[in-house]
Amino acid sequence: MAYDFKKEFRELYRPSGKPGVVTVPPMSYVAVRGKGDPNAEGGEYQNALPLLYGVAYAIKMSKKAPREIEGYFDFVVPPLEGFWWQDRADGEIDYARKDDFNFISCIRLPDFVTREDFDWAVSEAAAKKKLDLSAVELLRVDEGLCVQCMHTGPYDDEPATIDAMRAFAAERGYAPDFSEARLHHEIYLSDPRKCAPEKLKIVIRHPIKLI
């Protein structure tokens, strides 16, 4: 049976609908950076998605390729994730200013993926999918201490969940700890093309520190 990160790391992918504190281990991702409204047809965000999935599936399907990846095990491709920020010193997000978004869209990779394996997968996906993958990168992220919560509902309703997370953290002696390396993080467990907005499930995660 294929290894499923969502099942093996339930505390990271299936948190409660109530806020909680978690320490997130370092992870590797295939990632694409960009700017602009994620809903814009033909925008940078929409264009990034096939690049990410192309590389992720090239690694997954390497079991059928001539290349042997050391330590390989079959896995379910993890959900799409995103790190988001705007040009605000406090790290907060203004959902009314979607054109001002900066993002790193990404998909988690198994730890067995080396730089050489990644470069091979990029070349493989570029050849098979006829894609320009020059924007794709191998990203290592160490989030560390965070507050997180499962948000259920439309993206534009996220501020209410974030307010609850902020209050929960403050009551326990934590403060937000946003920086260039520690960002607003979302994990998308639902496909918005197939799911009603009120049923969307999104893990929201924010970096924190003890006061």
Question: Which residues are covered by each model-predicted region?
Answer:
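A solvent-exposed interaction/effector surface
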Residues: 1-211
